[in-house]
Amino acid sequence: MNRIIFSAITIVVIGLAGLFLFKAFYRPPLPVADNVIDVSADMGGFDKEEIHVNVGETVTIRLRSLDNSHHTDGGGQHQWAVDEFKVNVVAPPLGTAMATFTPTTPGTYVFYCDICCGGRINPTMNGKLVVEG
């Protein structure tokens, strides 16, 4: 009888641990929309090194921070900024934020996160925004 109770308790504990881990690490996919560019950032950098857009076309950047608030460098926040277009969006820990802008001049521009991880000088915390016209 004790063996059955022990087995049942073990199964419940393992099941609850699995549920906890699933909730802690599962990140549902973001919905897709027209002219919305999804960018994810974590302590390892951005998931996109280069983004192509068209001049004169309104674009929305949806930035998602994959880091939690327990990170000591930046507190889990991440930024996506392009100085030339005055774009600056900051996503909270494990959250999203959006910025909409219309690039007016063709060229290649730097986007960056200057909140953590060595800031914009870290090669993984910046990338290229290519505006084609």
Mark where each language-model region is.
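N-terminal edge beta-strand
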Residues: 29-59
